[in-house]
From Swiss-Prot:
Active-site annotation: D8 (nucleophile), D10 (proton donor)
Upper taxonomic lineage: Bacteria, Pseudomonadati, Pseudomonadota, Gammaproteobacteria, Lysobacterales
Keywords per UniProt: Amino-acid biosynthesis, Cytoplasm, Histidine biosynthesis, Hydrolase, Lyase, Magnesium, Metal-binding, Multifunctional enzyme
Pfam families noted in UniProt: Hydrolase_like (PF13242), IGPD (PF00475)
Name of the gene encoding the protein in the UniProt record: hisB
Protein name: Histidine biosynthesis bifunctional protein HisB
Amino acid sequence: MTPILFVDRDGTLITEPADYQIDAYEKLRFVDHVIPAMLKLRDAGYQFVIVSNQDGLGSESFPRASFDGPNNLMLQIFASQGIEFREVLIDCSWPSDNAPTRKPGVGLMVPYLQDRTIDWARSAMVGDRITDIQFAQNLNIRGFQLRTDEFGGEWDWPGIAHELADAPRRAVVQRNTKETRIRVELDLDRVAEPKTATGLPFFDHMLEQIGKHGGFALDIRAEGDLHIDEHHTIEDTGLALGQALREALGDKRGIGRYGFDPESSPWQVAGDTAQHGFTLPMDETIASAALDFSGRPYFVFDGQFKRDRLGDMPTELVPHFFRSICDASGVNLHLTVRGENDHHKVEACFKALARALRQAIRREGSALPTTKGAL
C-alpha cells in the first residue's frame, strides 16, 4: 500500500503573494526547504497530490492562461529535481459558492477514497491554512499546518519530513516523587545539542555526553532535594532516562539491539582482564561498554575511583546511576574502566555507554532482533 502526501500549493509549495494570485512568472518563489524535504518523503515511499483552491480561476480577474504558465514552470522545476506529482487537483470556485469540491470539502477526493491501494494510516495533508487542517480531518488523516506569519502554524518542511519519513522514536517521561521532579525528553532519530539542568554541573556535563555521543536529541531537567544530598537526584535521573529509552524503542523492532566492538577489536591494553565492548580511550584511561536491550536488566561494573567526589558528584553514585538506567530500561550493561585520572575515568564511562547505545539503537530493518518473538 502507498501513502500519499496531499499538499496545498500557494503558501505550501510556493510562497503566496499579497494579492493571493500567482499569475506571473516573477511571483514564483519556492517555500524554504520544500524540495529536500519532499525528496526525503519520496524516498520513504510517498506519492504527492496537489489539492488547491484557486478562487475564480478562469474568470476575467484570474485568466487560466495567467495561471498555467507559472504553474507549469513550478511542476517542471519539481520534476527536474526528481519530484513528480500523481495528480494536480484544482478547485476554481469562489468561497461564496460553498462547493463540495472546495477545501475543506472532499469532493475532489472521491476516486482516492475508493482506492484500496492507498495507505491511509500513513497519508497526510500539508497546508498553510486552517482549512487545510480541516480537510485533513475530513479525510481522517494527519494534518500539518506550515508556520507562516499570516496564518500561524507550527511546522516547517524539515520537521514534517522527519515526522513522516523517520517515524521518530520519541519519549517524554515525567517522574515526580516527594524527593525529585525529573523530566526527560528524547528523540532517538534526531541529532541536536543536548540540554541538561539537574543542579549538579559535573553531572550535567556527563549527561551531555550521552546525547552528544549517542547521536540523539536529549533534554533532561531535574529538581531534587540537593539540600540533603545528591543521591535521589542522580538515581531518579537514571531511572527516568532508562524509562524514556524503553518507551522510545517500543517493541525494539528493527534495532541492532547490541552495542559492542567486533571480535577484531579486542581491548588489548587491559591484559588478563580484557573484555569485548565498545572501547573508548581518554588520555591514559580506557573504558569498555557492552550492552544488550534484552529486556532483562543486569549491570556489571569493573572499576575503581580514588577520589570521593568529582565536582558535585560522588563517585560512588557513578555505577549506581548506570544501574538505575539498566533497571528502568531493561538493558544488560557490562562497563569496565581502567586509568589514573578519575575525571577521565568517569567521563570515559559515560562516553563508552553513549557509543554503545548509538550502535544498539541503530535501525537495521524491520525484523525483531530475537527468536523469542518479544523483547
